[in-house]
Amino acid sequence: MLILTRKVGESLLIGDDISITILNVRGNQVKIGVNAPKDVSVHREEIYQRIKQAEEKESTS
């Protein structure tokens, strides 16, 4: 795992077309902004897990 340190307003790039910007830090919460092409899905991990579980449930029905 790559670990990076960023300050508010700073960004990191993934490939040529995805950027993640730190928008705000308050206590133990970090607000980030993600710029990605429309064909790239961006989800919080817990939402992604629910989507995958629903897909698995549909495929076994």
Curated annotation (Swiss-Prot):
Keywords: Activator, Cytoplasm, Repressor, RNA-binding, Translation regulation
Gene3D superfamilies xref list: Translational regulator CsrA (2.60.40.4380)
Claim: Cytoplasm is one of the keywords in the record: yes
GO terms of biological process kind: mRNA catabolic process; negative regulation of translational initiation; positive regulation of translational initiation; regulation of carbohydrate metabolic process
Stored InterPro entries: CsrA, CsrA_sf
Gene Ontology molecular function: any one: mRNA 5'-UTR binding
Name of one Pfam family that matches: CsrA
Subcellular location: Cytoplasm
A cellular-component GO term for this protein: cytosol
Subunit details: Homodimer; the beta-strands of each monomer intercalate to form a hydrophobic core, while the alpha-helices form wings that extend away from the core.
Record function comment: A key translational regulator that binds mRNA to regulate translation initiation and/or mRNA stability. Mediates global changes in gene expression, shifting from rapid growth to stress survival by linking envelope stress, the stringent response and the catabolite repression systems. Usually binds in the 5'-UTR; binding at or near the Shine-Dalgarno sequence prevents ribosome-binding, repressing translation, binding elsewhere in the 5'-UTR can activate translation and/or stabilize the mRNA. Its function is antagonized by small RNA(s).
Family the UniProt entry places it in: Belongs to the CsrA/RsmA family.
HAMAP family: CsrA (MF_00167)
NCBIfam families according to UniProt: csrA, PRK01712.1
Protein name in UniProt: Translational regulator CsrA
